[in-house]
Amino acid sequence: MRRLLIVLTLVLSACAGGPSDQQALCGPSGRLRVGLVGSEEGQRGSAGVILAEQEQFKLRELLMASSRCDVLLEPVLSPEQARLRLRNSEWDLAFLPPGLTAVALEQEGQFSLVRQLGRRQNSRSQLIVRADSRFKTRADLRGTRLGLLPRGSLTGFYLPLFNLHGLTLSQVGYELTYQDLMQGLQNGEFDAIAWDGALPTQGNEIRVIHEDTHAIPLGALALSQPLLAQDYKPFVQKLDDNVSQLPSSLGYATGVIPDLLMLQELRAIVSKVEGWSLPQAGQPYVVYGAPSPSMPGEGPL
């Protein structure tokens, strides 16, 4: 009943002002297709727990009331699947973590960022090994088995590869979460894995052999060009006004535009790595490509 009252209040307030008020904000399909990846990378166990079912229902209700359009909510755990949907313009708006935010900016102006998502956690992209490993530096990882998050992750894919340029790896494997990568490292499936420095580790059981210097930006709510070509600001304002009804795990920041300056450098790295030949699961891989000498950060060995 409480959720119904919230939706009715939003709809009635939207209708009360007359014909000059907000029009329906819909995508080209006549609906609003919403990508839900969340604000964090590699920390969910299945697509169903990006948000609990009740939270998804509540989010959809708020988006419908705010847009006056039918909403199709599409939770996606895999950053690779989300990257493909962004590239194919399958979403009208999306709640994205940092890596996919950078990917969205690469889509030839198809998306713009309108609100910041997430909470500052001092994330850093790391490469870690078991404490008893003989590997001490990045260069020691030649011929090893590396565990990554899927393509689309900033801390778990793009930055680790950028920092391993020039190495030949015996095998690259993928997991959907950092927890699964850690399990693979402990079980001997991987010799080294990508890791987010903001996450707790297994104490003395692991060792960091490299940490990237780039600060990791937060995620973003991205809107597609067809929405941006319409009067989208009342929709965003309604989200701002009802932020308490949004799932807290999204970290929606009322009135806060994402930090584009911080994103630009990482966007360049994403673009650079996307131009390389990329690793196939279970196959040997030569980290291929030539990062620009003028690009700040760690880069080649």
Language model: regions and residue ranges:
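Short helix-initiation/N-cap motifs at beta->coil->alpha
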Residues: L73-L84, Q171-Q183, A215-I216
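A local structural motif
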Residues: M64-P75, L164-L176, I206, Q280-G289, ...
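Bilobed "Venus flytrap"/periplasmic-binding protein-like clamshell domains
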Residues: R31-A65, N122-Q183, N187, L263-Q264
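Extracytoplasmic small-molecule ligand-binding "clamshell" domains
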Residues: Q22-A102
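Acidic, polar ligand-binding/catalytic clefts
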Residues: V76-L77, Q81-D140
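A ligand-binding cleft/hinge motif common to bilobed small-molecule-binding domains
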Residues: F95-E108, Q183-I216
